Regions:
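ER/secretory pathway lumenal C-terminal domains and tails of membrane proteins involved
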Residues: 4-158, 165-238, 250-467
Length: 467
């Protein structure tokens, strides 16, 4: 190992305070990572996809057989990745296998130098295109500082850079026309024809390789999943389903907006619920769906930094206990009371306790069609939500989590609420133990099962009790 690669032994701490040994990379190691991964693998590889060729459309994580750039010239490709003819047919015949033989790259380089060496005016034009190329390409690499094992290929982030290089490709055709005109002074029409042929052949080669890459016919997986999520929800009560992120939200939106599927249901994206503009939308009716039960005025959630995070301060429990003594008819631990008197503040609120309760409207629960594990008598009077996990992990609750509580507190169990199965474990707002899987969504119930469970499991358990 080079002396510059020697790491320093250090001790790291995770977010829970646990320590473990590790090694601190050197500045030289960081530089090598920047050049080899962030610049070469995460930019130039994508650049060469577009102007040299692409191995296949399988996401590459450094393997020799997935997602690399190629040229279509065997001795070059074999030198970089091994004998490509030995790859299985599934990879050789992959629709993303595109070979351009570096023709667009060569034409672009010709245009680059042609522009740069056309006198003072050409130099000024060159720098304009160059900085467009740089600022939409390598400058984004510097800004993003990407980590390894990205969830998907990121070539789309640099599309502007590829457009800029396409300007040089166009100038490459102009360069060929200029050179042909000098060689064929007596035949200017022939020179123009030759340049035009080259200018047409290169994009024709590209389109012949890439046309089949973009065939989306008969791809119904996303559409079907979105429809199944919506059809999971009950037909009555204008149900709400919480999603998170783009990929598990857009298929549902497509089904509602384009095909008119379950327009009575409301899809609520928790990633967006952190913002004021999306909260505005959720407070308005949409198609056949009623507004979400958010009673806050806009003043209390406008995005000014004061209403994005709400710390949990259980040391204020004594104040709640004193309030309960003074007025036994009021439960200061009731979620709606906490939200109205402590959280909904102009200067930013907080939770004065690490556990809250939600009163249960038993009649509404029965009428909602919710599965009752042990019959009507098993419905609890209150639902107890622990905030201890949120306090330990992040010290408080973010606005999107608080908005879930706001809806839960004011829906009065008359509006079914569901969590999409694609939600991560940290997106349940502490309601994991109260969720029952129905189809492709977890229904929020007043029953504490100790963990997320499925409806089928509950029915099987109930049956076993009567055997």
């Amino acid at each position: 190992m080079c002396i510059r690669d020697r790491f320093k032994d250090v001790t790291f701490s995770d977010k829970d305070g646990n320590t473990y040994p590790g090694q601190m990379p050197t500045q030289w190691s960081n530089l090598k990572f920047f050049l080899s991964y962030q610049v070469n693998f995460m930019y130039w590889r994508y650049f060469m996809w577009n102007f040299a060729g692409r191995q296949n459309d399988i996401q590459g994580l450094g393997e020799l057989e997935h997602g690399n750039w190629i040229t279509g010239i065997p001795f070059i490709d074999n030198a970089m990745y091994g004998d490509q003819s030995l790859l299985p047919k599934t990879l050789q015949e992959n629709k993303g296998h595109n070979v351009f033989y570096c023709l667009p790259l060569i034409l672009g380089l010709i245009g680059l130098f042609f522009q740069a060496y056309r006198g003072e005016k050409g130099v000024r034009q060159f720098w304009v295109v160059f900085f467009l190329f740089f600022m939409t390409g390598l400058a984004i690499v510097l800004y993003l500082n990407q980590t390894p094992s990205q969830p998907r290929e990121r070539d789309y982030a640099y599309a502007g850079s590829f457009y800029a290089f396409a300007i040089w490709i166009g100038l490459g055709v102009a360069a060929l026309a200029s050179w042909a005109e000098k060689l064929l002074k007596s035949k200017p029409q022939l020179a123009a024809a030759l340049a035009s042929v080259v200018g047409v052949l290169v994009p024709l080669q590209m389109v012949s390789q890439t046309w089949d890459d973009h065939d989306r016919s008969n791809r119904y997986t996303c559409r079907d999943f979105g429809a199944n999520y919506l059809n999971t929800l009950p037909d009555k009560g204008c149900p709400v389903i919480f999603t998170n992120g783009d990929n598990d939200t857009f298929p549902l939106w497509y089904n509602q907006e384009v095909e008119g599927t379950r327009t009575d249901a409301r899809v609520c994206n928790l990633s967006y619920l952190q913002t004021d503009w999306y909260t505005d939308q959720m407070r308005r009716p949409a198609y056949d769906s009623k507004p979400l039960p958010i009673t806050w005025s806009r003043y209390y959630y406008v995005d000014n930094g004061k209403h994005s995070y709400y710390p949990i301060r259980p040391e204020h429990k004594a104040e709640l206990d004193e309030l309960k003594k003074q007025n036994p008819k009021v439960d200061p631990y009731e979620l709606s009371y906490i939200l109205d008197h402590y959280v909904k503040k102009a200067e930013g609120g907080y939770f004065p306790t690490d556990s809250v309760v939600v009163s249960v409207n038993k009649q509404a629960v029965i009428e909602s069609g919710m599965y009752l594990p042990m019959g009507k008598d098993s419905i609890p009077d209150k639902m107890i939500i622990s905030l201890k996990n949120a306090q330990q992990k992040q010290g408080g609750l973010y606005r999107n989590e608080v908005m879930i509580y706001e809806m839960l507190a004011h829906a009065d169990w008359k509006r079914p609420m569901y969590m999409s199965v694609t939600l991560g474990p940290g997106n349940y707002a502490g309601l994991d133990n109260y969720c029952v899987l129905e189809g492709l969504a977890y229904r929020i119930t007043p029953f504490n099962y100790g963990q997320t469970v499925s409806y089928t499991h509950l029915r099987a358990h109930e049956t076993s009790l009567h055997l």
